[in-house]
C-alpha cells in the first residue's frame, strides 16, 4: 500500500467531513420577512386560505387579503389595549409619552413590521395563525 494514500484520502474527504459535521441549520432561525415574503411564509406555516370562514368563496386578492386581515386583527387588539377605562376616584391617567415612544410601541405590536425589521421564527409565525 502506498504511504501517501491515507494522506490523499484525508485531503479529499476532509472538506466533506467538515461540511457533514458542521452546525446544522435550526428550524428556529430568525428570518427577515418583508412584504409578500412575510405573507407567503404565513400561508406556508398556517396552511393556506382554506381556513377562511367562507370556504366556497374563491381566494381573490391573495397577499392583500392577508395584510388586511393582519391590520384589522392588530388594529382591534390595539384599540382594546389603548381603550380609556374608567378610573376610580383619586386615580389619574398616566402622563402622555413622547411621539417616539408611541411610534416604537405601535411598531412592536405590528407583526409584519417586526418580522421585517427583526426577523421571525416559525414559532412566531404560528402565533399569528387564525386557528
Swiss-Prot record:
- Residues in the signal sequence: 1-20
Q: Which GO terms describe its biological process?
A: adenylate cyclase-inhibiting G protein-coupled receptor signaling pathway
* Primary localization: secreted
Q: Does the keyword Cytoplasm apply?
A: no
> InterPro entries recorded for this chain?
INSL3/INSL4, Insulin-like, Insulin-like_sf, Insulin_CS
Entry-linked SMART domains: IlGF
Tell me which GO cellular component terms the UniProt record holds: extracellular space
* Keywords for this protein: Cleavage on pair of basic residues, Disulfide bond, Hormone, Secreted, Signal
Family stated for the protein in its record: Belongs to the insulin family.
**UniProt protein name:** Insulin-like 3
State the species of origin.
Pan troglodytes
Amino acid at each position: 500500500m502506498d504511504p501517501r494514500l491515507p494522506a490523499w484520502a484525508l485531503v479529499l474527504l476532509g472538506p466533506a467531513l467538515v461540511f457533514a459535521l458542521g452546525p446544522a441549520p435550526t428550524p428556529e432561525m430568525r428570518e427577515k420577512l418583508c412584504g409578500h415574503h412575510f405573507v407567503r411564509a404565513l400561508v406556508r406555516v398556517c396552511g393556506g386560505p382554506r381556513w377562511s370562514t367562507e370556504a366556497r368563496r374563491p381566494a381573490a386578492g391573495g397577499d392583500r387579503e392577508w395584510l388586511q386581515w393582519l391590520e384589522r386583527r392588530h388594529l382591534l387588539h390595539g384599540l382594546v389595549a389603548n381603550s380609556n377605562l374608567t378610573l376610580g376616584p383619586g386615580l389619574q391617567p398616566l402622563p402622555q409619552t413622547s411621539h417616539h415612544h408611541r411610534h416604537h410601541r405601535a411598531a412592536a405590536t405590528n407583526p409584519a413590521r417586526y418580522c421585517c425589521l427583526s426577523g421571525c421564527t416559525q414559532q412566531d409565525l404560528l402565533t399569528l395563525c387564525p386557528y
